Regions:
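N-terminal mitochondrial targeting presequence
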Residues: 1-66, 72-110, 560
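PP2C/PPM-type serine/threonine phosphatase catalytic core
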Residues: 79-184, 190-560
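Calcium-binding motifs, dominated by EF-hand helix-loop-helix domains
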Residues: 69, 188
Length: 560
């Protein structure tokens, strides 16, 4: 573990031009060793330098601001020497008025407004949804929340129900029923722009439903044993992923090379940017949860074993250039190419090894026409071809699919973009949801017995899968020293996870600081965060309704 530490200095202005130091305390940012040479959490390449966070709170008559200084460190941990010194060209701005306040320090950085507690809460609650599902189909409630870092946010999501014919004629309660539900929950972690993730949120479910339709209308498939039917499901999901990506990339560029217009270049934006994809499908007929992952978003289930102990199990494996299985696959597909994986990235550039879009890792010509021959006014919309590109495609949208039977001990599923897992471990996530349940979904209807400590959670993920997952690395040393603290303030459980993620073990000052940093500066300290939590079970009502939990929902309409 390499720890980059600077100091946080709290200052106050007693009079114009007078600054008084009130106190100092450490503010730390930690990286695991494989992340110190590139931008933490970024799916695009860094500059080979890590940035340490140095802040000072500056008080004024009408505002409180946070001073951020970027110290560029070499891989050896020593201060680098840019042309103007390690910390240079520093100015102080009042961002509300966009005016120069003062030259607090010629060797510090821009001064940024530190949000009030009310403003922090407003930002955390700006994008959240929560619904109780009264369908007696195995899903009791789901919560979704987002916290942008990029502007606009590059993540997207989808929640949708597809009603399908029942193949057994009874529902979970043993009653006659001609229809069952497929619950779709998707998280799409975009990079290089929001265009690919937005397209996935609009179109992926319909592509999957189209491929699943023959299974429900084929008597042979309906009467097949569970193993055969599961294989048909997985094949249909994988086919839909590949078909959609083919339409996104090849379809767009085929139109572009045959008619190279600005309009066709703009319609190719979902092929130019990229997105990871995490899609979970819960089948109410047999309580089966299928998780398909393309990229490095992650799905977990949390539950209680017969002895009353909490457990977590990951249902997906991070597909990145740090995953030995993915590295082996790519090297076998491109034998003899030394640049296939460099610094943990595909062709030294892209962190996820599987993704939608990202045309430049998949083709350099189509129908015999090279993309480099496109007119200049069209190529200006495209991105540079990566170094070491010899035999594309290098990146695929083909998912890895897992199938899990949801039994009574399994309480909920958590899905999130990789930004959450940079800040929290799998065990911490389940412990935080379990703690939230004690207050907001108590089994006995009382909140009097809420314990003070987070529960102990065992990770039952297979060792091989666990070894392939990226571990939390941001602010780890501070979090470890905080003694397992947490914050419990949000009625939306997804927002609860997002609030705790940057808290470094329950520290409100970390939440305030990291939420206050605006885009694009914030991208150096946290990623876009998108979280979905679905609770398994059935509500006391069975009227087919979807009820908004208003205390946990901003002004959004349900998507199910």
């Amino acid at each position: 573990m390499m720890l980059l530490t600077r100091s946080e200095t709290i200052l106050a202005r007693n009079a114009p031009g007078v600054v008084k130091v009130l106190l100092s305390k450490p503010f730390q940012r930690a990286y695991s060793s494989f992340d110190t040479k590139r931008a933490a959490g970024s799916k695009v390449p860094g500059r080979g330098r890590s940035r340490a966070l140095n802040l000072a709170l500056v008080g004024g008559s009408s505002t409180v601001a946070v001073l951020l200084a970027y110290n560029f460190l070499s891989s050896g941990g020593q201060l680098a020497s840019p042309s103007r010194g390690p910390i240079s060209d520093i100015r102080s701005f009042h961002t509300q008025q966009n005016k120069l306040l003062s030259d607090v320090n010629r060797n510090s950085s821009d001064t940024l407004v530190l949000l009030s507690e009310e403003e922090v809460n407003r930002r955390l609650h700006a994008i959240q949804e929560s619904y109780t599902v009264n369908r007696a189909k195995g899903i009791l409630r789901y919560d979704v929340a987002q916290l942008p870092s990029n502007h606009p946010i590059e993540d997207n999501h989808i929640e949708q129900i597809v009603t399908v014919p029942s193949t057994r004629g009874v529902n979970l309660k043993g009653q006659e029923n001609e229809e069952e539900d497929l619950y779709f929950f998707g998280i799409f972690d975009g990079h290089g722009g929001p265009f690919t993730s937005a397209k996935l949120s609009r179109e992926l479910v319909s592509y999957v439903a189209k491929q699943l339709y023959p299974i429900y209308n084929d008597s042979v498939a309906n009467n097949s044993d569970e193993k055969v039917r599961s294989s048909l499901f997985s094949k249909a999901i994988a086919t839909s992923f590949l078909e959609l990506d083919k339409d996104i990339v090849q379809g767009a560029f085929r139109r572009l090379v045959h008619e190279p217009t600005r309009e066709n270049a703009l319609t190719a934006l979902p092929a130019i940017s990229g997105s990871c994809c995490l899609l979970s499908i819960f089948d109410s007929e047999d309580s089966t949860l299928r998780v398909a992952v393309t990229g490095d978003s992650r799905a977990l289930i949390g539950g209680v074993d017969p002895e009353g102990r909490w457990f977590v199990k990951a249902l997906s494996v991070d597909q990145t250039g740090d995953n030995p299985t993915e590295v082996k696959r790519l090297k076998s597909e491109h034998p003899g190419e030394k640049g296939v994986i460099r610094r943990g990235r595909v062709l030294g550039s892209l962190q996820p090894t599987r993704a939608f879009g990202d045309y430049r890792f998949k083709l350099d010509a189509i129908d015999g026409k090279k993309l480099s021959d496109l007119p200049n006014d069209v190529r200006m919309y495209l991105r540079n071809i990566p170094n070491y590109l010899l035999t594309p495609p290098y990146v695929t949208a083909e998912p890895v699919i897992t199938t899990t039977k949801i039994v009574p001990g399994i309480k909920f599923m958590v899905m999130a973009s990789d930004g959450l897992f940079e800040l929290l471990t799998n065990e911490e996530i389940v412990a935080l949801v379990a703690k939230w349940q004690e207050r907001y979904m108590p089994q006995n209807g009382s909140t009097e017995n809420v314990s003070k400590q987070l529960p102990i959670v065992r990770d039952i993920t297979s060792s091989s899968d666990a070894d392939s997952q990226r571990t939390d690395f941001r602010y780890k040393e501070v979090k470890d020293s905080s003694g397992g603290g947490y914050l419990l303030e949000d009625s939306n459980v997804a927002t609860h996870l997002i609030r705790n993620a940057p808290s470094a073990g329950g520290r409100k000052d970390y939440v305030t600081t990291l939420v206050s940093i605006p885009s694009p500066m914030s991208r150096n300290y946290r990623d876009d965060l998108t979280v979905t939590v679905a609770f398994f079970g059935n509500s006391t009502k069975d009227d087919g309704s979807l009820v908004v939990n208003h205390d946990a929902t901003s002004d959004h309409k349900p998507k199910l």
